[in-house]
Amino acid sequence: FGDPQAKTVKRLKKQVLAINELETVYEKMSLEKLAKQTEEFKKQLKEKKSLDDIMPHAFAVVREASKRTLGMRHFDVQLIGGMALHEGNVAEMKTGEGKTLVATAPIYLNALTGKGAHVVTVNDYLAQRDAGWMAQVYHALGLSTGVIVADQSFIFDPEFINKNHVDERMQHLKPCTRKEAYGADVTYGTNNEFGFDYLRDNMVNTVENLRQRELNFAIVDEVDSILIDEARTPLIISAPSVDSGSGYAMFAEVARKLTPEDYELDEKRRSVALNDHGVEKVQKLLKISNLYDPEHIRLIYHMDQALKAQTLFRREKEYVITKEGEIVIVDEFTGRLMHGRRYNEGLHQAIEAKEGVEVQQESMTLATISFQNYFRLYDKLSGMTGTASTEAEEFNQIYGIDVIEIPA
């Protein structure tokens, strides 16, 4: 019955014709009159029109606002990408197709419901840059824009100027509360911060202290990296545990005495386990007869972590040591230092012992969620990437979303 992919693109191309025909209508309007369309669209939605009904007009309005505020006009291919996102798909577009601009039309359209719309980026810089840049379009149309990054949140305010930012696109981001940033019509942020705020909200006692509102619509940039590569990465909020367990230094010493003949190492799977030879050696070093005796369950736990720290975690690659003697994790995707993050289940302590720095108290997990489970909470999820068709099956199986290749 033909290629469903080609059918979708053909259908979306027809819609582009409708949007293009509206261009002359909105070109004639003043910016003030253009902004009034937002209220008109909201009114139509209240009168039971659907987002799909108003989409051609909404997209045409965003294109016009973008031309006037940014001097950037959405190409047809960017409108096709935007429609694919609005329909809850992954839009696969060649880099250089201006993905930042592609997101504006579907974000504007979905923000009209008043339930919020999120743009998810891979790092703090992109979240702030894209928000400050594209917020000019939303602001011209009467919508507010918030940004959430590590330890800070902002709201776009053209009256506010922060001269410290060299990049003009970030100068109008005014510090605000987390709740205000989420309360904006549009919110930009990183996958880590969206996820952690969700966990923090699950630990508050009163509704007033909630940061997020409902998870309505999200566009995830670099979607293959966040939703597939990092899908099972757990986000963890922890507190110091009463039983911190001792003996990390002793186990680090034992691990140092082991050689590659004592364990099976699988770098690709990030796993390591003692073989029979290694078990015997450890038993001798610890002066015990059977490592796997139930009474030694804590020993096995410590030994496993010490072995992992010794063989799988390398200084300057997975972590660095600060001048203060603190072990700081390096993000494997961005190379950035992840201050305040610690490996769980005693692994961080094992690395501290291996490096001979102060071993900090072990922590207890209070709340945890994987990116996969967090993003499945959105009513509608979509994403952008340069290379997703290889993972098309996974996107469909895990998230129920299709990958649409947008023709250049």
Which sequence ranges carry the predicted segments?
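Conserved P-loop NTPase motor core
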Residues: 1-408
